Amino acid sequence: MRVSLAASLFAGIALSLGASVSLCSAQINGSTINGHRIIVPDSSIPRPGRIHTNYFIVDSGARNNDAPPPDAETPASLACVYKLVKGTKGCPIATSKNVPTGGVGAIAIVDAGDYPTAKQDLHTFSSQFGIPDGDFQIVYADGHKPPVYSNWEVEEALDIEWAHAMAPKAKLFLVESKLCTSNKCNTDPTWQAVKVAGELVAKNGGGVVSMSFGDAEWAQERQFDHYMTTPGVVYFAASGDGGIGFTIHPGASPNVVAVGGTFFNRDSNGDFINEQYYTGGGGGGISLYEPRPSYQDVIKKIVGSKRGIPDVASDFCCAAIYLQGWGEVGGTSWSSPTFAGIVSAAGQLKKSSKDELTMIYKEYANKQQHKAYFNDITQGDSRCKVGWDVCAGVGSPKTYAGK
């Protein structure tokens, strides 16, 4: 069957290639990548007072959706580039086969809305890449199944498939929340889901929580930071897709590891060349309201008195996903669950986000460790410098060491 990528991903959802799609100029570098149109779903467009996801879709036009897109990164190709597995020269997408096999404790993904085909899609994705099914459970944050929200199933598929791909031995929870759809919510229901996610992870041996959503920073955001402090849990959050200078919460919270976005440059043969900042995409900057945490004292000359994000980064574009058909998706929505899974697979779980971040910045302060444990991202924007920067933090993962 020949269908468009967007149509396959949005089957049953009120968005098609013929619709008028708003593109956020700050979210992406233009409206195409590798010659393909970028589609920013409604749920990924920032609006005041509304949480949004951080992903976009690559429209490959009419193509067969019964196999992964040939230019979409796979678990094996990404793991090869980041030296998480024994790889082949060039880490080509087509021939990289070795996938991560680790994972400890639990991983909880926080998303909005029900995803009816989650288990089937996760199984299909895993089978395609030689990944065992593992232990997967869907939890309703308030005890009741939420409605299906337009476009959020793509986010949920991306999150669970890639967290599981990086750490298949970890128990995986998908915590589904309702959304606040009016101005009458005292507290967005998503925060209850974050609380539930932390409790689930803590009860299952500790681990990580990944959040691929956010909202533009606002003056009262600090009152919600306590939701990311459950003992035994490290929280990861997307830094946003608004480019440098656009910071979001919870990504700006000092209680999360903020994950920014990069891009793999490949040659005409599909071999990896280098990694750069995803220009105009990965969110980063200095928080408007969060004070600089002590673990960032090592970069105080850069960030001043406020929190700087991201802390780390991972590939931003683009990932193979399965949602009743294969597609290609990008954004820091991919970066966050990927990095969370890598930390789980590293097997040295910390007792809190602060402990994880303290370790990361201590390693950054040690030039030898920083070079050994992270890829310093210095290309893609004039603000990408040697060392920590608002492009990619301390860098992207290099092996499991120091994670």
Where are these regions (language model features)?
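Bacterial N-terminal signal peptides
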Residues: 8-20
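Positively charged n-region of N-terminal signal peptides that target proteins for export
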Residues: 1-5
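Extracellular protease catalytic domains of secreted zymogens
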Residues: 174-403
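Residues embedded in well-ordered secondary-structure elements
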Residues: 15, 96-98, 152, 248, ...
